[in-house]
Each structure stands twice: as C-alpha cells, then as structure tokens.
Curated annotation (Swiss-Prot):
It comes from Roseobacter denitrificans (strain ATCC 33942 / OCh 114) (Erythrobacter sp. (strain OCh 114)). One of its GO terms (cellular component) is plasma membrane. InterPro entries: UppP (IPR003824). PANTHER family: UNDECAPRENYL-DIPHOSPHATASE. Belongs to the UppP family. It catalyses: di-trans,octa-cis-undecaprenyl diphosphate + H2O = di-trans,octa-cis-undecaprenyl phosphate + phosphate + H(+). It is found in: Cell inner membrane. It is a multi-pass membrane protein. This is Undecaprenyl-diphosphatase. The lineage of its organism: Bacteria, Pseudomonadati, Pseudomonadota, Alphaproteobacteria, Rhodobacterales.
Length: 267
C-alpha cells in the first residue's frame, strides 16, 4: 500500500466518519472508482481506532460521565445521570449489533458493497435527512434523551449497515424527527458512535489477529494518527457550524454524489 493511498484512506475515513455523508460508502467507492486495491482489514481497524479516539476526546466530559455511570449500572443501579446515559447508549447499540452479526453471517455485507447501492442510499437517505431537518420540532436537547428515543435511534442505526447510508446521518435524521435540536441530535449521534465503533472495530480486529507484521503495524499507526486528526477537525467544524447552519449543505453533497454514482453505475 503506497503512502499516498494510505493518507487518502485515512483522510477520507476521518473527514467523513462523523459527517452525515457515509464514511463506509466513500471507502467502498475508493477502490471501485480509482482502481486502487482495497485497503484491507488492518487499515480499516486502524482508521476506526483513530476516529474513535477523536470522538472520545471531543466529547470527553460526556464520555467520562457515562463511563463512571456504567460502573453503577453494572451493579444494577440507574440512579445517576451517568448510569442513565450508559443505559441509553447500551439500548441504542444492541439493535445494530444484532443486525450486523446477522448480515455478516449471511454474507449480505459483501452483496451490498456496490456503486449502485451507495448511489441510491446517498440520494435517498440524503433527502430523508432534509425532510427530517426541515420538519423536526427542535424543542428538545440532548440532556432530555429517553430510553424510548435511544431504542428508536438504535433501530434507525441498523440502516447504516447499508453502505452509503451514513451512521451519523441516519441517527441524526431519527433524532431530528423526534424533536431534538440540531446540536443535540448531532451530539447524541456522536455519543452513539462510540460503542458502535468499538464493536465494529473488535469484529474487524478479530479477523486480523495473528496476521500483523512490522509494516502493517507501521501503516496502521500512521493511518490511525491521520484519521484521528482529520476526524477531530471535521467533528469540531460540524458542531460549530450547526450553531447557525442546517444540514442542507450535507444533503446537497449527498444528492449530487448520489446522482453521479447512479449515472456511473448504470451507464
């Protein structure tokens, strides 16, 4: 794997992981459209680790509260803000973990990795995000997250297993329709990403254990560092822009890219 390809993969993963434009969709498109070889599972794991560290750092205060609360939750107590947040995150993660396992065991994940699928999901779910963002009530904040909403957002997150959907995009869409204001919707989507990335990274990591060598470790470390920096910058920029800008720019990007991909796929 060339240095340029490595930098490109890490930058794409970092910049698109938390924006509602689908990182997995872009990574699938990279080899399909450029002729570059697939980056491999080891690099996938590395860029996931970099993205994970970025979101943990950005939302460290919330992560610390949830981590502390999880200790009380483990003792069967949901009597603190942290314990309740930890419970919500668990409930939000269970649906996608079950669905992801089923898809992996049945081989559906490989069947969905096509330019046409990504084109349709980019376009379709981009329009759904626009609808939800325009019609959402914006009367609720992230601090008002409920177990019911966590479960509903978790169900929506299942759709992110289809390349091109965008995990953050579909969970933000669900949150906006549930009445959460834009910053709150994005924050909840980002917090939900932490256990999801950990779970998917663990699954990918299990497939590469024992295959690592010095070159793979070096490439992985560089990819993780680059993904961390680009993800942190993208996350900070999005959260800042959401104070005054809607999700429409991301929708426009998704629609344009989706149409281009559909023309490419069917021509």
């Amino acid at each position: 794997m060339t240095l340029f390809h490595l930098i490109l993969v890490a930058a794409i993963q970092g910049l698109t992981e938390f924006l509602p434009v689908s990182s997995s969709g872009h990574l699938v498109l990279l080899p399909a459209l450029t002729g570059q070889p697939d980056q491999g599972l080891a690099i996938d794991v590395a860029v996931h680790v970099g993205s994970l560290l970025a979101v943990i750092l950005y939302f460290w205060s919330d992560v610390r509260i949830a981590a502390t609360g999880s200790l009380r939750l483990a003792r069967g107590k949901v009597d603190t803000q942290g314990a309740f947040l930890a419970l919500c995150l668990i409930i939000a993660t269970i649906p996608v973990m079950i669905a992801g396992l089923i898809i992996k065991l049945t081989g559906l994940d490989e069947m969905m990795r096509s330019v046409a699928v990504i084109g349709w999901t980019m376009l379709g779910f981009g329009l759904v995000l626009y609808w939800a963002d325009r019609t959402g009530a914006s009367t609720r904040t992230a601090s008002g997250w409920t177990l019911k909403d966590a479960f509903l957002m978790g169900l929506a997150q299942i759709l992110s297993l289809i390349p091109g959907t965008s995990r953050s995009g579909i969970t933000i869409t669900a949150a906006r329709r549930l009445g959460y204001e834009r910053e709150g919707a994005a924050k909840l989507a980002m917090l939900m990403s932490i256990p999801t990335i950990i779970a998917s990274g663990a699954v990918l990591g299990a497939d590469v254990i024992g295959e690592a060598d010095w070159q793979m470790a070096r490439d992985g470390a560089l990819a993780a560092a680059l993904a961390f920096v680009s993800a942190l910058l993208a996350l900070a920029l999005m959260m800042r822009l959401l104070k005054s800008v809607s999700f429409t720019p991301y929708v426009v990007y998704r629609v344009i890219l989706g149409l281009i991909l559909l023309v490419y796929a069917y021509s």
